[in-house]
């Protein structure tokens, strides 16, 4: 997260809400997992190799595994446990794009550190009332971004035992922002950079959609 850098952000629009399970079902019902034009080449190879046809932990289009056992999928809740590849394909399906990490960071800095975090005790993603969305900008799910996990300009590794963290991980991974329902409030901040490989699905990940403003 250091050193501090200046980044130019062009005008953009960001959906405050996470993409919902109902929206993901629309993607599935429109044959989204079988349309190569929506997918990055590596993503297409990944879903075909591992027969990915739905979010991780979905049993079918009605039920899923959760911390509480098998549950009926709530269409209003944010879709979770999706890979970067899936998030990217969905954004293309909706004729949108994934936000950059700096767009999400800017969004987070404009809002209080409130949301569905660990202390709330929900232990799951929840639907947010649109009227209170700005008061719930943190937590719920880690938000995929289109940004590669790379060092900031002027970055220098820590010394001694911490020297391996984080530079050795800055290879072929993407940044996620905002925290999740499993993130303690004192652990998250607008600048926090989480990172996973584009095929990873086990983490508490979701997506918001962005677009350019002309």
Functional labels for PLM-detected ranges:
Residues 1-9, 188-198:
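Short, polar loop/linker segments at the starts of domains and inter-domain junctions
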Residues 2-15, 21-22, 28-37, 46-49:
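Hydrophobic helix-coil surface modules that form long, contiguous segments used
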Residues 4, 9-11, 76, 141, ...:
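Extracellular structured ligand-interaction cores
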Residues 13-15, 93, 208-210:
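Residues within well-ordered beta-strands of beta-sheet-rich folds
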Residues 17, 32-190:
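Functional-site microenvironments in short loops/helix caps that host divalent-cation chemistry
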Residues 26-27, 89:
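Aromatic- and Gly/Pro-enriched helix-to-coil junctions and flexible linker segments
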Residues 202-214:
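Short, structured beta-strand segments at or near domain termini in extracellular proteins/domains
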């Amino acid at each position: 997260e250091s050193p501090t850098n200046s980044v130019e952000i062009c005008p953009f629009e960001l959906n405050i809400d996470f993409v919902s399970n109902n929206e993901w079902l629309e993607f599935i019902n429109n044959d989204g997992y079988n349309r190569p034009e929506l997918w990055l080449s590596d993503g297409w190879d990944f879903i075909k190799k591992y027969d990915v046809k739905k979010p991780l932990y979905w049993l079918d289009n009605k039920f899923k595994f959760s911390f509480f056992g098998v549950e009926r999928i709530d269409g209003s809740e944010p879709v979770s446990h999706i890979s970067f590849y899936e998030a990217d394909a969905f954004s293309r399906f909706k004729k949108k794009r994934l936000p950059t990490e700096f767009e999400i960071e800017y969004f987070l800095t404009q809002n209080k550190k409130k949301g569905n975090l660990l202390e709330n005790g929900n232990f799951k993603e929840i639907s947010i009332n649109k009227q209170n969305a700005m008061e719930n900008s943190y937590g719920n799910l880690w938000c995929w971004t289109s940004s590669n996990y790379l060092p900031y300009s002027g970055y220098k590794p820590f010394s001694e035992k911490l020297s391996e963290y984080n530079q050795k991980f800055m290879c072929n991974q993407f940044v996620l922002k905002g925290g999740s329902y499993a993130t303690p409030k004192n652990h998250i901040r607008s600048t926090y950079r989480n990172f996973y490989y584009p095929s990873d699905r086990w983490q508490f990940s979701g997506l918001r959609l962005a677009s350019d403003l002309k």
